Amino acid sequence: MSKLWGGRFTEEAEAWVEEFGASISFDQQLVNQDINGSIAHVTMLAKQGIVTKEEAEKIKIGLQYLLEEAKQNKLHFSVEAEDIHLNIEKMLIEKIGEVGGKLHTGRSRNDQVATDMHLYLKEKVEHIIKATKQLQTVLVHQAENNIETIMPGYTHLQRAQPISFAHHILAYFWMLERDVNRYEDSLKRINISPLGAGALAGTTFPIDREYSAELLGFNGMYENSLDAVSDRDFILEFLSNSSMLMMHLSRFCEELILWSSQEFQFIEMSDQYATGSSIMPQKKNPDMAELIRGKTGRVYGNLFSLLTVMKGLPLAYNKDLQEDKEGMFDTVKTVEGCLHIMAGMLETMTVNKEKMGQAVTQDFSNATEIADYLANKGLPFRQAHEIVGKLVLHCTQKGIYLVDVPLATYKEMSSLFEEDLYEVLSPYAAVKRRNSAGGTGFEQIEKALEKAKGLTKEVIKN
């Protein structure tokens, strides 16, 4: 077929060269955005008198037809037409005649593709925000059911201090809230229009960029035409935000994987989110959590790939920028899928409250309570720390825990110890007392839950 840009050329490219340079295999995902952008563009052209109202109406009817065909997956794309833009233009001309060729007046594929991607990411980021909020509601529900579920808190993966399981869950709620905030802030930069920037220098036609931006729901437009067609910051920001979100999901999945093991037994995954072994009949593997953890590296890779593409590009458009789309599409699909799986996995998991409770009665995570006990009686904390360290050593040598140590032995270490010491050794009491703002104390968790519910109330309504 003859190329829409073929006037300059006397030889046709080899078939394998065409295939190598074509992007239609993946940028066809922008079909809705491309057609909607074209409808806005031709509407603006008619308003400005650049095309007649009759021509614009004919073009819009043709575009609406193609849009309906696209929604029903009836469009057939060709590698020969290279990309989504030329495929749609070719189909339009075939449908309505040569007047379809006027659609591209005052526009380049450079500003066209940038517009498509802005529209695409605007829609997808809003979907991801909603999915993240839905995951947050699951976390809130689990936290509500586990306020007084006591578990070991860890540092260095060693038992550190007893905490409420709800407190641990809500830590991830607030991580996700920051992710939501980043996505929401990024919409300020996504929701601006490059349409009308042309190839790089604007156009000689009397276009109205503000009008076309308004038609497409953009809040503004790029101030510089070179920047408009060269910018991929908005995609990089999306990939960066998605990498952080996936990092948070991955960290949680790592803990879920550990907790579901025989060594912990803190939780059990629903059969819906676990798999078995082809050789070992007893196995119940946390495959979904492992996949989310694994797919995090995939999203990181998409970010680093585009950063590497962009680092050496002069202004304005270069064919390298064709490589900006597959990683973006892949990240959208990956993040949406992981959020959906994560929500279902957390909603259906069984929390083994008894096992968690046993864990904090058979360790030394209450050691800090004794140090605080002595400090509250006036002993410098560093001295209290030393005394309790010796008590822990004594216990490990005897094969006992702090609650088993007789008062007489405590008094040998410090005369400040009294019978009330044993009250502070209770893991439940230890958690309850940590009532500083943002702490694991039950009152603080109730306050945190109220805030969390306020941030997810719109999702809960829907």
Swiss-Prot record:
Catalytic activity: 2-(N(omega)-L-arginino)succinate = fumarate + L-arginine
Pfam families for the chain: ASL_C2, Lyase_1
Top EC group: lyase
Enzyme Commission number(s): 4.3.2.1
GO CC terms: cytosol
Localization of this protein: Cytoplasm
Functional pathway: Amino-acid biosynthesis; L-arginine biosynthesis; L-arginine from L-ornithine and carbamoyl phosphate: step 3/3
Alphabetical list of SUPFAM superfamilies matching this protein: L-aspartase-like
Matching InterPro entries: Arg_succ_lyase_C, Argininosuccinate_lyase, Fumarase/histidase_N, Fumarate_lyase_CS, Fumarate_lyase_fam, Fumarate_lyase_N, L-Aspartase-like
Keyword vocabulary terms for this entry: Amino-acid biosynthesis, Arginine biosynthesis, Cytoplasm, Lyase
Source organism, top-level taxon: Bacteria
An example molecular function term from Gene Ontology annotations: argininosuccinate lyase activity
Gene Ontology process terms (BP): arginine biosynthetic process via ornithine; L-arginine biosynthetic process
Family statement drawn from the similarity comment of this UniProt entry: Belongs to the lyase 1 family. Argininosuccinate lyase subfamily.
Name recorded for this polypeptide: Argininosuccinate lyase
Gene source species: Bacillus cereus (strain ATCC 10987 / NRS 248)
Lineage: Bacteria, Bacillati, Bacillota, Bacilli, Bacillales
